Amino acid sequence: MFDGGFSATSLAVFTALAPAGAVAFACLAAFLLVNRSQSRDWRDVLAHLLFIPLAIAWAGFIASATHLGTPANALHAINGLGRSPLSNEVVSAVAFLFFAGMAWMYSYREKPKASVMNGLLAISIVCVIVMLFHTSFAYSIATVPTWDTWLTPVNLCATALLSGPALATTVLQAVFTDEPALQTFYVRPYEQWPYALLLIAVAALAAGTVLLVCHMNFLGTVGNNVTLASALVPNYGWLIAAHTALAICGLAFQLHGLRLATSRTRGLVFSVIGCAVVIIAALLARFPFYDAYLSVGF
């Protein structure tokens, strides 16, 4: 727990879950926009499952509201829109939740118009980008040198690009599970998406691990009149190792689930477990950032 009422746990949960849910939603929205030729029933199933990443994002947003004292205080943050990084973060998150929620609810309409649905999905994708931008730079505080570094935004984005595609992969696999089994030597074009998403996650993991090591080394060069920042996170190296190991295991589980042609249901189970492990790995990557809180004063 920081001085000033900030909770490392609530903020870590927010920056792990909200970006993961938002990026996963954007991936699935892009999938729906690109694969418009699929049957309406098939698209409806996937659109209904948009609730999963939306719920993950909501969980993160609710966690973030707790460190404001009361969730109602989040409404007051809107007053600083345009001049306060926190206000920009809150408003962009609310905008995403609003349009993403509208898209999900509209999918239950008896005869939804494709143009309206596609428009809501496109706006939601834009909101995700804006939300990631403002969330990444919300911690650029000059009086907190451990946060005021270029490593802060890129680390958060790397974590989001790890967990978001992993979550989207699981949702897509849930849709594919309902389809008739295919011959193992043939993969429909749209079924290549989960593999592409996992490739993005692997690249994000590799880049994110390097960035975490850079941040750990950076903390050794920052301090105030009391201590060095590195002393605040003495187990940073072990956390990075655990984060990387868990993420590799989770992604391996998901890849195995995708390639398990004998039983798509079992494959989905592997994917769900793998996704959960990846999200835990993302949480491990976020905790050291908040534990390293160090102001320039005493």
Regions found by a protein language model. Name each.
Residues 1-7, 34-43, 109-113:
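Cytosolic juxtamembrane amphipathic/interface segments immediately preceding
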Residues 24-99:
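Membrane helical hairpin/interfacial module
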Residues 1-22:
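Hydrophobic transmembrane alpha-helical segments in integral membrane proteins
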Residues 17-19, 39, 94, 102-281:
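Long, contiguous internal "core" modules enriched in hydrophobic/ aromatic residues
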Residues 1-4, 78, 264:
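Helix-boundary and loop/linker segments of multi-pass membrane transporters
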Residues 283-298:
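Juxtamembrane boundary at the C-terminal end of a transmembrane helix
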Residues 24, 165, 282, 286-287:
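Transmembrane alpha-helical segments of multi-pass membrane transport proteins and ion-pumping complexes
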Residues 11, 76-85, 144-156, 230, ...:
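Non-cytosolic membrane-interface motifs at loop->transmembrane helix junctions
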